[in-house]
Swiss-Prot record:
Family: Belongs to the SNF7 family.
Subunit structure, as described in the record: Probable peripherally associated component of the endosomal sorting required for transport complex III (ESCRT-III). ESCRT-III components are thought to multimerize to form a flat lattice on the perimeter membrane of the endosome. Several assembly forms of ESCRT-III may exist that interact and act sequentially. Interacts with VTA1. Interacts with CHMP2A. Interacts with VTA1; the interaction involves soluble CHMP5. Interacts with NOD2. Interacts with BROX.
UniProt protein name: Charged multivesicular body protein 5
GO terms, biological process: autophagosome maturation; autophagy; cellular response to lipopolysaccharide; cellular response to muramyl dipeptide; endosome to lysosome transport; erythrocyte differentiation; late endosome to lysosome transport; lysosome organization
Coiled-coil region list: 26-179
Length: 219
């Protein structure tokens, strides 16, 4: 059937607000160009009128200038109307885009709430409390193990009063040791020989002095 009657053309999508705004702005720009050309004509006619004398010729130029000015006013009105249309469409487009953004935000929030509910279903408060209890028990067991490993064997019990008394006495002994240390140094010094050294003989029976040299008999 399509060979005889042809295939229906697909319908073009309706223009969006953005397309309409672009079309209206383009028309407004075209009108601005026309107004600029009319301004140039008005300047030319105004110069001619200044140079001309009163009479039919001057009146004719004035009529032309008035027609141009009337056209300018009409174009300006059309331009203002198009500018208002463009502004209204931009406001509507902004409102629509804001609503779309709001819907996207709401959808994202709904999805987030759904995911949160799903996550909460997988987390049980009882399980968390059981885990906390297990961790606490394990920490207590670990502390008991450390105490058992650090236990000392055969250590006699000491009286705190005796230890404090020994500590005080130990401080006095240390001070006494520091005060008498110079006496120990003096006692350890070599003794000074007393009197004159005695005469000694070598293996040959000859008298020698303290250096082992033969003594010279006194004359």
């Amino acid at each position: 059937m399509n060979r005889f009657f042809g295939k229906a053309k697909p319908k073009a999508p309706p223009p969006s607000l953005t397309d309409c705004i672009g079309t209206v702005d383009s028309r407004a720009e075209s009108i601005d160009k026309k107004i600029s050309r009319l301004d140039a004509e008005l300047v030319k006619y105004k110069d001619q009128i200044k140079k001309m004398r009163e009479g039919p010729a001057k009146n004719m130029v004035k009529q032309k200038a008035l027609r141009v000015l009337k056209q300018k006013r009409m174009y300006e009105q059309q331009r203002d109307n198009l500018a208002q249309q463009s502004f209204n469409m931009e406001q509507a487009n902004y409102t629509i885009q804001s609503l779309k953004d709001t819907k996207t935000t709401v959808d994202a929030m709904k999805l987030g709430v759904k995911e949160m509910k799903k996550a909460y279903k997988e987390v049980k408060i009882d399980q968390i409390e059981d885990l906390q209890d297990q961790l606490e028990d394990m920490m207590e067991d670990a502390n008991e193990i450390q105490e058992a490993l650090g236990r000392s064997y055969g250590t006699p019990e000491l009286d705190e009063d005796d230890l404090e008394a020994e500590l005080d006495a130990l401080g006095d002994e240390l001070l006494a040791d520091e005060d008498s240390s110079y006496l120990d140094e003096a006692a350890s010094a070599p003794a000074i020989p007393e009197g004159v050294p005695t005469d000694t003989k070598n293996k040959d029976g000859v008298l020698v002095d303290e250096f082992g040299l033969p003594q010279i008999p006194a004359s």
